[in-house]
Design a protein with these regions (language model features):
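Acidic, low-complexity Ser/Thr/Gly/Pro-rich repeat segments typical of extracellular/periplasmic
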Residues: 34-36, 42-112
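N-terminal signal peptide c-region/cleavage motif recognized by signal peptidases
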Residues: 14-16
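N-terminal edge beta-strand
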Residues: 18-37
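Positively charged n-region of N-terminal signal peptides that target proteins for export
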Residues: 1-6
Length: 114
């Protein structure tokens, strides 16, 4: 009986760990150097998420870059923002999102503009 309970708990733990939302794609891509900057910031997730924070930093000058957040959806699998005009330099996008199960997920993408 205890073995059955342990097996069920193990299966439940595995299925719960796979249910969290994940970022499946981000543009600009992490660790990429661009000669031509993408026209937008695009984030794709495997489930509906609410983007609760997104910032862009020019890493080499320690400057925060203003982003136009008006196009953000409340909950969506894909979030798109217009890309601000960027000069040559190293940049980072940091983001946080709320998944349907209430967990906060976060990440970053570092890229360079030549």
């Amino acid at each position: 009986m205890i073995r059955i309970i342990l097996v069920l708990l193990f299966i439940f733990k595995i299925s719960a760990s796979y249910s969290h939302s994940q970022l499946s794609e981000i543009l600009p891509k992490d660790n990429v150097t661009y000669v031509k900057v993408p026209s937008q910031i695009n984030m794709k997730f495997n489930s509906l998420v609410k983007l609760v924070k997104i910032i862009m930093i020019r890493v080499d000058k320690k400057e925060k870059i203003n982003l136009d957040l008006t196009s953000l959806n409340d909950r969506a699998k894909e979030h798109t923002l217009p890309m601000p005009k960027l000069s040559s330099g190293k940049y980072r996008i940091e983001w946080r999102a709320l998944s349907p199960d209430g967990h906060i997920i976060k990440g970053k993408s570092d890229f360079e503009v030549k």
